[in-house]
């Protein structure tokens, strides 16, 4: 069964240039990697991808997350790959963490997807539309908050 989890954000605080959603993406990617999963982070654009790349490199050594931008890194990619619409590898991944504002048609290739319901009202409507699209695509839907 395919599962999609939507994390509900209760703030829109920016820290070190990262939105609340982007901060959470880094934490979830780290957690999923530590549990042995290969992760694809699908960014909205190249600028966001580079921002997340820098944030993951800036983590303390004890919480380092091996990652690369799509098309870079070792053969087959690092355990966590950061992509955007114009740049995505075909390397197999266990989990999709989607930062896309619209439903990513390639999401159906994953058995686990992480998405977000941002704090901003204008973005909540887009999240509702993605939620409906995942349901139509046959995903089991869940909502969660981060610890």
UniProtKB/Swiss-Prot annotation:
Pfam family, one: DNA_pol3_chi
Reaction it catalyzes: DNA(n) + a 2'-deoxyribonucleoside 5'-triphosphate = DNA(n+1) + diphosphate
One BP annotation, GO: DNA replication
EC number: 2.7.7.7
Disruption-associated phenotype: Knockout mutants are sensitive to high levels of chain-terminating nucleoside analog 3' azidothymidine (AZT).
Record's function text: Part of the beta sliding clamp loading complex, which hydrolyzes ATP to load the beta clamp onto primed DNA to form the DNA replication pre-initiation complex. DNA polymerase III is a complex, multichain enzyme responsible for most of the replicative synthesis in bacteria. This DNA polymerase also exhibits 3' to 5' exonuclease activity. Genetically identified as involved in the repair of replication forks and tolerance of the chain-terminating nucleoside analog 3' AZT. This subunit may stabilize YoaA and/or stimulate the helicase activity of YoaA.
Name of the protein in question: DNA polymerase III subunit chi
Gene: holC
């Amino acid at each position: 069964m395919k599962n999609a989890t939507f994390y509900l954000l209760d703030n829109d605080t920016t820290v070190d240039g990262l939105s609340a959603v982007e901060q959470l993406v880094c934490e979830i990617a780290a957690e999923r990697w530590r549990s042995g999963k290969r992760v694809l982070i699908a960014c909205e654009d190249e600028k966001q991808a580079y921002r997340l790349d820098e944030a993951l490199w800036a983590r303390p050594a004890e919480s380092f997350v091996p990652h690369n931008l799509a098309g870079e890194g070792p053969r087959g990619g690092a355990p966590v790959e950061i992509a955007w619409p114009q740049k995505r590898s075909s390397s197999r991944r266990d989990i999709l963490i989607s930062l896309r504002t619209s439903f990513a048609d390639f999401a159906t290739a994953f058995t686990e997807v992480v998405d977000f319901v941002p704090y901003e009202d204008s973005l909540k409507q887009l999240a509702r539309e993605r939620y409906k699209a995942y349901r139509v695509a046959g995903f089991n839907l869940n909502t969660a908050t981060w610890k």
